[in-house]
Amino acid sequence: MSKKPVVLMILDGFGLTNKVDGNAVSAANKPNLDNILKKYPHTQLGASGMDVGLPEGQMGNSEVGHLNIGAGRIVYQALTKITKSISDGDFFENVALNKAIENVKKNNSTLHLLGLLSPGGVHSHIDHLKGLIKLAKEKDIKKVYIHAFLDGRDVAPSSAKEYIEDIENYMNEIGVGEIATISGRYYAMDRDKRWERVQLCYNAIVLGKGEEANSAVEGLEKSYRDNKTDEFVLPSVVLKEGKPKAKIENKDSVVFFNFRPDRARELTRAINDKVFDGFERETLDLTYVTVTEYDSTLENVEVAFPPEHLNNTLGEYVSKNGKKQLRIAETEKYAHVTFFFNGGVEEPNEGEDRVLIPSPKVATYDMQPEMNAYEVTDKLLERLDEDKYDMVILNFANPDMVGHTGVFEAAKKAIETVDECVGKIVNKVLEKDGTAFITADHGNSEEMIDYSTGKPMTAHTTNPVPFMYVSKNSKELREGGKLADIAPTMLQLMNLPKPSEMTGNSLIK
């Protein structure tokens, strides 16, 4: 007998806005989604700010979106938690951070602060770096060096100068800290095992080798002259009297202040793992602190803000009730439909199968806007024909990953690809008498122009996202929902009572 699967399709970075300029979502030819909107109930969901546990006005992102969807409750994010701890003063008493401080005092060594220098709030926040500099000042640490990773992706592509000057002014004011290296996030924050990129960043911060400049701004301006925006700035060493200002050396302390794990793991492993095979390098004896847990298998790492365990996430609860589930995505979003969707738990639930389709190896995804969506779709259709699964969670990476390139025509093509795939999947789900829910984790490709400057916008947005309910007997949906309401809606369709931990509410009227 055919199971009636409940399928959740997350179209990553597919937001909604009435504005037409720079809107790849509205410009794309998408007959399947247009038809679904005509025929089936749909609503809009909040996917940013307080709706997902972020500060008001803060754009959503994939990690946060999948956490909230999978948890069925608002999950207060590391950004909100750390900012609050700085304003409450608890931050300055943090045990892990103070271990880094004590090590520097004991060995008369150096404190290195690594992370994305940006107010973007997706991977890091510049205010958290200021908190760390203030902590160093309060504890009377003299040798404090910043290894600044430049953004240009969650903020405007060429905005780094503003943030470099902001942090330099803060350090001058407070009387401690200097920038030792700068590096585009393309090198410092890879997540696809492109070790040749990570190695260039490692060489700058550990060996003092790379592009050279007499100041961070000089290094940045040199990069701009070579037509490289912030994200792609080659790892550069800031010199003092012809020598690198600082390198990470034995007995030093390192604090990596990115709070989002996925793009901080590789560099952490390169610097701190005792056994490492990404490239040849010496092992260092460091006190290494990460503000959040990047990976539970990392050794010799202190975690300043350890994860809080989320009980009864959608996947866990469905599993406890004896149901079978499938998670499927390509590499770029695989962690999102597994680790993040499961509340930061790496282990699959019982009865949870996973399918990973490798993302194409291209320099930037505007070169292949369809990415591997067709392969994901074909594999899913095969799996649906096995009639094994009660629930399927699927992510299409295209609207987000191609939206990040800022190339409008490519983003349009990305949406058109996804539309084609959605059409095939919806037909199969209806054939099985199942239900398809179509949503997104945050916006991106619906707003590819910065309306204030007219320049390309590569960041996420604060726009709402769609929620479409496709089945042979769809019911009306209520307004005013948020991502946390999706899991309770799916449980209702699966005839499972909502667990007490889920504070979201079903979207079905």
Swiss-Prot record:
Cofactor binding note of this UniProt entry: Binds 2 manganese ions per subunit.
GO terms assigned for molecular function: manganese ion binding; phosphoglycerate mutase activity
Binding site for Mn(2+) 1: D400, H404, H460
One example of a Gene Ontology biological process annotation: glucose catabolic process
Enzyme's top EC category: isomerase
InterPro entries in the record: Alkaline_phosphatase_core_sf (IPR017850), BPG-indep_PGM_N (IPR011258), Metalloenzyme (IPR006124), PGAM_B_sf (IPR036646), Pgm_bpd_ind (IPR005995)
EC number: 5.4.2.12
Binding site for substrate: H123, R153, D154, R185, R191, R260, P261, D262, R263, K333
Keyword ATP-binding in annotation: no
Family annotation (CDD domains): iPGM (cd16010)
Pathway: Carbohydrate degradation; glycolysis; pyruvate from D-glyceraldehyde 3-phosphate: step 3/5
One Gene Ontology term, aspect cellular component: cytosol
Binding-site list for Mn(2+) 2: D12, S62, D441, H442
The entry's keywords: Glycolysis, Isomerase, Manganese, Metal-binding
Catalytic activity: (2R)-2-phosphoglycerate = (2R)-3-phosphoglycerate
Pfam families to which the protein is assigned, alphabetical: iPGM_N, Metalloenzyme
Catalytic residues, chain numbering: S62 (phosphoserine intermediate)
HAMAP family: GpmI
NCBIfam families: pgm_bpd_ind
Family named by the database record: Belongs to the BPG-independent phosphoglycerate mutase family.
Purpose: Catalyzes the interconversion of 2-phosphoglycerate and 3-phosphoglycerate.
Assembly and binders: Monomer.
Protein name from the UniProt record: 2,3-bisphosphoglycerate-independent phosphoglycerate mutase
Provenance organism: Clostridium botulinum (strain ATCC 19397 / Type A)
